[in-house]
Amino acid sequence: MRFKRLALLFIVGCAVFCANAVSVAFQIVQHGDSEIRSSSYVIEEGLFDFFFGKGIIISNSPAIASDGVENDASFFEKSRQESWEGGVDYFVELTADFSSSNSTNPDADLLENLSSLSYKVLNVGSGAVLGSGKKIPPASSQFKDKRKGLSDFAFGIADDIYKIIRR
């Protein structure tokens, strides 16, 4: 009986020792407005919900409104450096391009206000790009709940990122 207890203790100890958690950090840089849209926060919330549901430790840097692509690199580099200091495994750069020129309600959380969302997944330690992509949202008229449509779109992006991380 004593041998069984020791064997069980050894197996549990090995399992705990081998267990490790994956951590992901991200930052959303928004183009198209000088103020952060609430849509960016809905996307952020969708990413948090998705990764938390998968058991992944998730953190973010605050969303930033950028006036041009030339500033994006410095924003992302600062956030990636903070992620490295925090011991994060992966960093995701998200760029949300908004265009509300044809929108019926430019201030609302609508998919039609989002032109595209691009992402790049980096290994924080090596700086290597593991994958990237860009998605254009579907027609928002197919969603009865406009906010849910934006959240579902964020879940789709998060799923693509998750597949890159799990390769």
Annotate the PLM regions:
Residues 1-7:
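Bacterial N-terminal signal peptides that target proteins for export
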Residues 24, 92-96, 119:
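Generic structural motif
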Residues 11, 84, 109-111:
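Generic marker of residues within folded, mature protein domains
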Residues 31-33, 99, 140:
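A short, flexible beta-alpha/helix-coil linker loop
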Residues 26-93, 128, 132:
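N-terminal segment of the mature soluble domain
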Residues 88-105:
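Charged, amphipathic alpha-helical segments
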Residues 21-25, 41-43, 50-55, 101-103, ...:
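C-terminal/domain-edge helix-coil "capping" segments
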Residues 7-16:
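Bacterial N-terminal signal peptides
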